[in-house]
Regions:
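Short catalytic/ligand-binding loop motif for oxyanion handling, primarily in non-cytosolic enzymes
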Residues: 114, 262-263
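Iron-sulfur (Fe-S) cluster-binding modules
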Residues: 1-228, 238-251, 270-483
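Glycine-rich nucleotide phosphate-binding loop and flanking beta-alpha elements
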Residues: 70, 234-235, 259-261
């Protein structure tokens, strides 16, 4: 039960729903509270990313008000809005966000009484739901509750100058919650790797050399020139390690999709840490319930790192100077990134070291892509093979290429698989998953019910469009139990 009045953000078409809100005010129609109203040119201009942002910033609910079907001055903007919000609501529901928090309604310009009734109904529904907490801090606190260890500075490195002239720069490679693919991306440099080793001193690389935490702690603050950190932050121990490297390094680089966006690891937030532990160590797991398995031995106990409440991209824990995207980053991207970061004028400010252009521009299937693909039916790779040499979107197969950065060369498409967005969004796209929900929802065809049916037929919108970016983009409301 909500402890306060629900906060509603209302995106209202200026030609109809916004005019209805004015009409409700002039006629003094009573409703529990006035929502925060935002006038838009058309309901079809309401990007799903704006709805996600409103929920992430603490709104209890979002209302999208558009013209009745057939009345849209942009022909089908209202129907596009309904299709998009159907996809978005289903993705949010996968994470435990109640469908009642997002509502699409058709409201005519002279329907002030209807507007007041809709707001009243929405407020009453939201009152029965848990209160949305204020937005969580952008980064973790300087000390984690289960942390300990040395004192930490909140921001940036602790000082130190670049390695003296004539000495090799010091670099570090470190991993958090990852699969090992980013380590392979460095190995895949091939002949360039020995040259790198000759030009730089590697002080930390768990996959290749033995180094202890105490050795890194003993270094002066800022002694490492560049620290490349891959993997999402999933454990309190990983957050502590990221803070240590931030203090000891002049520059910290988020290396790979998991460090940049949370990666596939972030999809664990759909269920939450309790469900993850239960699936791995619960009483129904064969290796746990095996009567013949050896039991605990008496002696000293060793505490295990704790799972954080949710998965975090690296920049939610420490400031990041640059990003090398990809799952894994491609060899040309890694080569150029290393050269730039070890140069006399390294990039900073969180720069993403990959071309800022859509993958579609270099896609080998681009010649077969219609100017505006139309989605008449959904096709799935699990049930039928795609047509070789033809744009995936034109075939009704979900593909994230339109909103994804170039840089992958593009390996998946050349192997007959659609893009899943591992290189992250192009500038301006914001949340890649929300951008693709907007794009994919807009491609649906037919009347209102047919468009909604097509949008609802996609089996897994969260895993399809937020495969790599769920942790970075979606509201922090993980479930407490299983799905």
């Amino acid at each position: 039960m909500s402890a306060r009045e629900p906060r509603i953000v209302a995106f209202l078409c200026e030609a109809c729903a916004y005019a209805a809100a004015d009409d409700a005010g002039r006629a003094r129609y009573v409703h529990p509270q006035a929502p925060l109203t935002l006038r838009v040119a058309c309901a079809g201009r309401v990007e799903p990313g704006l709805v996600v942002q409103a929920l992430r910033e603490g709104a209890d609910g979002v209302l999208v008000g558009g013209c009745h079907p057939g009345d849209c001055r942009f022909v089908d903007g209202n129907l596009r809005a309904a299709s998009r919000m159907t996809l978005l609501t289903r993705a949010l529901e996968q994470a435990g966000v109640e469908p009642a928090r997002v509502r699409v309604e058709w409201i005519g310009a002279n329907e002030g009484e209807r507007f007041a009734r809709i707001v009243t109904e929405m407020v009453e529904e939201l009152r029965a739901l848990p209160t949305v907490p204020p937005r969580a801090p952008q980064r973790l606190p300087a000390r984690l509750p289960s942390g300990g260890g040395e004192g930490r500075k909140e921001e940036g490195a602790g000082g130190g100058e670049r390695s003296a002239a004539g000495t090799r720069p010091r670099i570090a490679f470190y991993w958090n919650a990852s699969c090992g693919g980013c380590e392979e991306a460095v190995i895949d440099l091939g002949e360039a790797l020995p040259r790198l080793m000759a030009q730089a001193e590697v002080v930390l690389w768990p996959a290749a050399i033995d180094a202890k935490r105490a050795e890194i702690e003993a270094l002066p603050d800022g002694a490492i020139d560049v620290a490349f950190v891959n993997g999402a932050v999933r454990l309190d121990e990983q957050a502590d390690g990221a803070r240590l490297l931030r203090r000891k390094s002049r520059r910290v680089v988020a290396f790979g999709a998991c460090a940049q966006l949370g990666g596939i690891v972030g999809l664990g937030d759909l269920d939450g840490p309790e469900a993850i532990l239960d699936a791995a160590y619960g009483p129904d797991v064969p290796s746990v319930s095996n009567p013949g398995a050896p039991g605990p031995s008496p002696g000293d106990s060793l505490p295990l790192p704790a799972l954080l409440p949710r998965t975090l991209p690296l920049d939610r824990v420490v400031p990041v100077d640059a990003v090398v995207p990809g799952c894994p980053p491609s060899t040309p991207i890694v080569e150029r990134a290393l050269a730039a970061l070890l140069s006399d004028a390294p990039p900073g400010g969180g720069a993403v070291l990959a071309p800022d252009a859509s993958l579609c521009e270099t896609c080998p299937l681009r010649e077969s892509r219609p100017e505006r693909p139309a989605l008449h039916a959904l096709r799935r790779l699990a049930t039928e093979a795609p047509e070789p040499g033809r744009c995936f979107l034109a075939q009704g197969i979900a593909c994230s290429g339109p909103a994804t950065r170039q840089g992958c060369q593009p390996g998946c498409v050349e192997a007959g698989m659609p893009c899943r967005g591992c290189f992250g969004p192009v500038s301006g796209a914001g949340d890649l998953g929300a951008a693709m929900v907007g794009a994919f929802g807009s491609l649906t065809t037919g009347d209102g019910p047919e468009r909604t049916r097509l949008a609802a037929a996609l089996p897994d919108p969260a895993g399809t469009f937020w495969r790599y970016g769920w942790a970075a983009g979606m509201p922090a409301r993980p479930r407490r139990g299983g799905r």
